[in-house]
């Protein structure tokens, strides 16, 4: 029975526990145990695979803590306060303009300057006071940020999108359906369009009403007010730019963050004696999320070790018969479960392509329709997953004052506004392209 599959069972348990507001860290550990026990693994092997798998996100976790430290250090110079004032004057009291500006800025982090979530702990916490003044519902801001972290790599062959499209092209070609990497976007733009619809619904309909928040201090940060750009502020920006350049050249986000902190010390923007304070503040801001990413990698490792993903994918054949509509629907839903389980849309493609592409050929799907189904099946579950950086990133910035719930204010809104449109877009694309 498909409900007893370790992947399905553990994802359901994780979802229920998170919705009941159990800490995500504990929910992941319990879900990992459920997956292991359901697959008949000894408890020692389960914990061994959990711990061994954590290394998969070690660099990400270190990046989060160092980015938090950098964010606290930058905030201490007052440049964040100036940036907040500049953005406030730009949006001129219009919260919808702010949401769209942040969505566009977030998109740039995936292609124009591919730094992924690195900008969030630096840019978003200083803007919380402005959001409070505008009575902006932070659930809308979570949707804006997640849109920018997801839509560009799905729809555009630039930055992280080029990697995603390259994996799609390679796996499809390997399994009997040729498509050039540069042609993938000609199909996946449909999914991007449906995500834009989800974003607009979140901004203009679902979270349009005012929402009150208190002006509370930020975790690990002291408010530093500044009005005009001075020499130390320009040097701080120079250090931040250096971090991005080093990250782009070396491919190492931790190295970029360390370089920025070193530059700020050399420029005497921050003091040696304050480094401990910045580290403690960075851990306070990003520490929990870093640990969640570690445990999420361990959970994903257990899911893979059970062999249940292959069983789940293989079970599709017997479920759909010759129905094109049912086949597409099942492929999308199974993709959703797998991505929520292993935690990466990029990693889902190789797992499902070996079964999905022959199945698409059998059902008579076109190359374009198959691209859409495979891309949607992989991308589903990234938004809305409690352990995805597409949700943890936004929460890290929006919860800097402790007033933003990860599950109900980030995961649930982004799941509704992006996974449902992706399901619809994937189904329509598969059926009619």
How does the language model describe each region?
Residues 43-132, 276-361:
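Membrane-embedded alpha-helical segments and adjacent helix-loop junctions characteristic
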Residues 4, 8, 26-29, 61, ...:
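Hydrophobic alpha-helical transmembrane segments
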Residues 4-15, 22-42, 61-69, 233-244, ...:
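Hydrophobic mid-bilayer segments of alpha-helices in multi-pass membrane transport proteins
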């Amino acid at each position: 029975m498909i409900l007893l599959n370790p992947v399905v069972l553990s994802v359901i348990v994780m979802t229920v526990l998170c919705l009941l507001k159990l800490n995500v860290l504990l929910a992941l550990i319990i879900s990992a145990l459920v997956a292991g026990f359901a697959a008949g693994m000894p408890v020692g092997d389960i914990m061994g695979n959990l711990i061994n798998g954590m290394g998969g996100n070690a660099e990400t976790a270190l990046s989060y803590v160092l980015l938090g430290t950098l964010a606290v250090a930058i905030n201490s110079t007052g440049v964040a306060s100036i940036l907040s004032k500049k953005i406030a004057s730009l949006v001129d009291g219009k919260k919808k303009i702010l949401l769209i500006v942040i969505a566009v800025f977030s998109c740039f982090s995936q292609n124009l300057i591919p730094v992924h979530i690195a900008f969030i702990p630096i840019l978003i916490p200083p803007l919380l006071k402005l959001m409070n003044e505008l009575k902006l519902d932070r659930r809308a801001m979570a949707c804006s940020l997640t849109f920018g972290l997801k839509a560009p790599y799905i729809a555009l062959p630039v930055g992280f999108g080029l990697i995603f499209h390259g994996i799609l092209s390679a796996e499809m070609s390997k399994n009997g359906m040729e498509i050039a990497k540069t042609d993938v976007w000609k199909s996946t733009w449909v999914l991007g369009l449906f995500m834009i619809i989800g974003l607009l619904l979140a901004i203009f309909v679902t979270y349009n009403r005012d929402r009150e928040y208190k002006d509370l201090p930020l975790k690990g940060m002291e408010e530093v007010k500044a009005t005009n750009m001075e020499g130390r502020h320009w040097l701080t920006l120079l250090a931040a730019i250096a971090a991005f350049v080093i990250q782009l050249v070396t491919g190492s986000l931790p190295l970029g963050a360390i370089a920025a902190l070193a530059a700020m010390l050399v420029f005497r923007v921050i003091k040696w004696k304050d480094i401990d304070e910045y580290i403690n503040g960075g851990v306070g801001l990003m520490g929990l999320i870093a640990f969640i990413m570690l445990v999420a990698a361990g959970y994903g490792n257990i899911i893979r070790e059970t062999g249940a993903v292959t069983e789940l994918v293989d079970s599709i054949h017997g479920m759909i018969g010759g129905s094109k509509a049912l086949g597409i629907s099942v492929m999308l839903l199974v993709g959703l479960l797998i991505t929520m389980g292993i935690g990466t849309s990029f990693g889902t493609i190789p797992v499902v392509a070996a079964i999905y592409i022959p199945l698409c050929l059998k059902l008579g799907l076109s190359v374009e329709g198959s691209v859409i189904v495979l891309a949607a099946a992989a991308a589903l579950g990234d938004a809305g997953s409690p352990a995805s950086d597409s949700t943890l990133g936004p929460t890290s910035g929006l919860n800097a004052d402790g007033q933003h719930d990860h599950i109900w204010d980030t995961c649930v809104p982004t799941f509704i506004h992006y996974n449902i449109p992706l399901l619809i877009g994937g189904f329509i694309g598969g059926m009619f392209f």
